[in-house]
Amino acid sequence: MKAILVTVLALAMASRMAGAQQLQLPADKALEERIRTLDLAHAEAIFKGDAAALQELLPDDHTVNHPTNRIVQEKAELLKLIGSGVIRYTRFERRPEKFLFYKDMVVVMGDETVVPAPGAPNAGVVLRRRYTNAWMFHDGKWQLAFRHANNVPPPL
């Protein structure tokens, strides 16, 4: 009797854990292309300092764990940094590598190469970054809810 009870409990726990691990959805090629387009449009908007495009791509509470070792907590703060030249580039290349699909969210992970413009921190230095962007579907559209980017140190 004890062995049966242990077996039933083990199976119940295993099935519960398996269900909990099913958060990630299967790949969706059409959605991947849509998010890839948005992800690259975001990079282009940052590169060009296109405030109108960023207004559309970012929610008001957009948050960035920024490679300058600070957290930028709102779209308005980010736009102010772009307008003041703290965030400005002479080169910005983004290469999305991995897409993870969840209910109402797609996470994109990839690689970036940027060269900050004169007046910006690290001006003229080629910086390689790893990034993670979280795109969320809200109010009928996909927006970049939060982002993390970190500079990769050059090889020794």
Segment roles from a protein language model:
Residues V6-R16:
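Bacterial N-terminal signal peptides
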